[in-house]
Amino acid sequence: MPLRVYNTLTGSKEEFVPINPGKVGMYVCGVTVYDHCHIGHARANVVFDMIYRHLLSKGLEVTYVRNYTDIDDKIINRANRDGVAYNEISERFIKEFDNDMARLMLQLPTFQPKATEHIPEIINLVQKLIDKGFAYQSGSDVFYRVDRFEGYLKLSKRNLEDMQAGARIDVDERKEHPMDFALWKGAKPGEPYWESPWGQGRPGWHIECSAMSTKFLGETLDIHGGGKDLIFPHHENEIAQSEAASGKPFVKYWLHNGFVNINSEKMSKSLGNFFTIKEILESYDAEVLRFFLLSAHYRSPIDFSDQNLKEAELGLERIYKALAGIDERLASGAHTPADADNTEFAEKVAGFAGRFGDAMDDDFNTALALGHLFDLVRVINRELPTASTGLLEKVKAEVAKMAAVLGICDSVPAAFLQRMKDRKTSDMEMSAEEIETLIAERAEARKAKNFKRGDEIRDLLLEKNIVLLDSAQGTTWKVK
């Protein structure tokens, strides 16, 4: 089936048809680098990394641009608070962001421009808007005339008059209209600045994205993405700037991811439920966090809680255990002839792969795609003992292909499962080695028909939340 995406601009799902056949230009708003990134930033970036991966998997040539906002009031305030230069703050948190994204297994975008490296392009764009009558100078500031742009608020579906009437807007005598927004800000004493035709100053937040997206992707983009919180004012203002300057549609498809709630409440510093990526990864594996963020449809809200993270961990382990089972069969040398294969198994694998692709083509429905992947895991576990090595190799490759679109299961299965065991036992009184020693002792006791001792060991481990799993292949264990 063709790829269909939900376009915020039209409010409907549409078939995705690139402006230039076979090529896609995608711009995603990056972070303002003044502090550590939180779970909401993680979701937005994981979502658009997944979208990037899926587009690539369909054979499209994707130019993916994600910016850094490295000059802003928040950065200046942080620099003043810490008593350092603004760029010391921005460079520090760019490194922190890059480290967080690497741990979450994001592929690098094609370009990662910084606002401060594109001041000439920003100044040229502001001047163009002034020349066309869409912007005006007021002292050393430059503002955009919102009532001059006919399509203003078409993305957020708001009404300018209603907003003006219902909002508490401080009177700003520099502005012609209360909703006008800054394109260029005159520098205050002690602030960083760049020379411009309007005096020393720096760019406003919205203009930088218009300038950088146009530089790298042209006047009309295929995809522009970000969180729903950016629809207004940021993306609305980008449209106003870019379309007024070029006279062309700015973006063909607007994509926005949903919010992250914390234990069913909106995330907020004032509520004390604000978590950085760094804090979360002290308690959970990065791949588990990524898996969790993809477990819901990207446009839906997702509820971050310990219970939901633990469920994500169990789900990811299920996939890895199936892959580990395949690896063990292949490594054992046990050979099952191909003519003994269950042809229904091979057909089911192909069917699941097709349904996975269809789910991803239906507005990147990762929740449904993961459901098909879990269905495949159940079939693998059932057919594993009797399938031929040749078929298992094909199944493993098919699972890897699906997982790669989601950016999961890139670890060696046995290594991932061991990592999970180590993490779970790190706070326990017993080490993994001690548990294995007791399991070996229990096996010897049972062999000697000393079932009382065997039961004692099982009960001792159960008291410490260690559950033993007996099978024909031996005994394994898991944390309860």
From Swiss-Prot:
Return the cofactor note field: Binds 1 zinc ion per subunit.
Cofactor(s) recorded for this entry are:
Zn(2+)
* InterPro entries xrefs: Cys-tRNA-ligase, Cys-tRNA-synt_Ia_DALR, Cys-tRNA/MSH_ligase, Rossmann-like_a/b/a_fold, tRNA-synt_1_cat_dom, tRNAsynth_Ia_anticodon-bd
Q: Where in the cell is it found?
A: Cytoplasm
**Broad class of the protein's primary localization:** cytoplasm
Motif ('KMSKS' region) on chain? 266-270
In the record, what terms sit under GO molecular function? ATP binding; cysteine-tRNA ligase activity; zinc ion binding
GO BP, one example?
cysteinyl-tRNA aminoacylation
First-tier enzyme category under EC: ligase
Q: Where, by residue number, does Zn(2+) bind?
A: C29, C209, H234, E238
The record's Pfam families line, in alphabetical order, gives: DALR_2, tRNA-synt_1e
Q: Which residues cross the membrane?
A: none
Self-association state and partner proteins as the record states = Monomer.
Protein name according to UniProt: Cysteine--tRNA ligase
Gene designation per UniProt: cysS
